[in-house]
UniProtKB/Swiss-Prot annotation:
SUPFAM superfamilies with a match to the protein in the record: ARM repeat (SSF48371)
Recorded superkingdom: Eukaryota
Taxonomic source organism: Mus musculus (Mouse)
Quaternary structure annotation from Swiss-Prot or TrEMBL: V-ATPase is a heteromultimeric enzyme made up of two complexes: the ATP-hydrolytic V1 complex and the proton translocation V0 complex. The V1 complex consists of three catalytic AB heterodimers that form a heterohexamer, three peripheral stalks each consisting of EG heterodimers, one central rotor including subunits D and F, and the regulatory subunits C and H. The proton translocation complex V0 consists of the proton transport subunit a, a ring of proteolipid subunits c9c'', rotary subunit d, subunits e and f, and the accessory subunits ATP6AP1/Ac45 and ATP6AP2/PRR. Interacts with AP2M1.
PANTHER family associated with the record: V-TYPE PROTON ATPASE SUBUNIT H (PTHR10698:SF0)
Listed name of the protein: V-type proton ATPase subunit H
One record GO biological process: synaptic vesicle lumen acidification
Primary location group: membrane
Amino acid sequence: MTKMDIRGAVDAAVPTNIIAAKAAEVRANKVNWQSYLQGQMISAEDCEFIQRFEMKRSSEDKQEMLQTEGSQCAKTFINLMTHISKEQTVQYILTMVDDMLQENHQRVSIFFDYAKRSKSTAWPYFLPMLNRQDPFTVHMAARIIAKLAAWGKELMEGSDLNYYFNWIKTQLSSQKLRGSGVAVETGTISSSDSSQYVQCVAGCLQLMLRVNEYRFAWVEADGVNCIMGVLSNKCGFQLQYQMIFSIWLLAFSPQMCEHLRRYNIIPVLSDILQESVKEKVTRIILAAFRNFLEKSTERETRQEYALAMIQCKVLKQLENLEQQKYDDEDISEDIKFLLEKLGESVQDLSSFDEYSSELKSGRLEWSPVHKSEKFWRENAVRLNEKNYELLKILTKLLEVSDDPQVLAVAAHDVGEYVRHYPRGKRVIEQLGGKQLVMNHMHHEDQQVRYNALLAVQKLMVHNWEYLGKQLQSEQPQTAAARS
């Protein structure tokens, strides 16, 4: 990976402001371990160890102690977490564990080694903490789990990993709901604090996705839709950056690049790039674009991503970005790389590639191919390729889009397809397209009504020449002016 990966990985492990501030407050409130010992809530062994551990101020002193007493350390921390219920003390224990791991990543091994002795895994010690009520406790536990999973030699697997990823998805989705204006139960947490806790969750995901095996598990858990949902809503630039960082990490795997084709990621990222005022957001989008073009091993996949970028006007954005000065040389290198690759793709661009890319982006407009008799004559049959992939997208747009221009162009294209492909009517009917077009004959927008009517008539009529003469008198002025 590039050096940016290392920077990002460090960013992901650093706590957000609210957690850092609360952790400082927690550290300052020392625990009276003797009172727990007198109350018989902890053992003399654990009490003695934790007091000695607290006295080790320097990292070197702690390391020396952990090398000889690592097992006791893990045992004591787990015993304390298990037997003490007071929230303030649990916060203190988790903060000590998190500090210890942050100081030296290799220390995660003490928990794995201890668990192995009892023929268990480290996860059951920390996963139940995610169900607690206190947000600081929950998010500290989440950070520790991510560090154990990302830095340990043993992978989190099966139901433990599913549970953790589902928890992350739920937290990120709560942010998505907040962005859409839906009321979300956040207890006494302010929206500012809440967004910082969500950034902490995103940081956990960033750490996890540095491990290739977790990338596949995240995708299988429908995690990409979760990321896209957050990005599609209004979220702060920091969370935006973290979500795109996660996409960038996923795109290091050639198999992932192949899989990510289905999520329409390029239009969303190009919109964010267009509006971005933060250099770090610009940088991570360009790096993600580069991964899509560089890590994909299949030529067809690379070409599809390149065409999507061209369709979304990324070339123009790159030319504008090229004029600016950057402190980060990665940005300049990525701009140069992308300009070169997209420039090559433009040279190879056929009218069908252009049409296919526009259709897959879901952003239909009256580009020249739609009105080109030659295009439809030569390419109508190609809409049947890959089990009618493009026709299915076309009919889906008629079903779900609320953009009048998209609906008008889609209805027009259905009509042109059936006009130029002899068995087109039957195919469109089987895909439910005929009914969808008919539904738009009474649309409030005149262009949608007109193109739906035209398409329905093409679905019904056999004499195209006669139909053409009939329609000239019906064509609305706006359409006449455009053509």
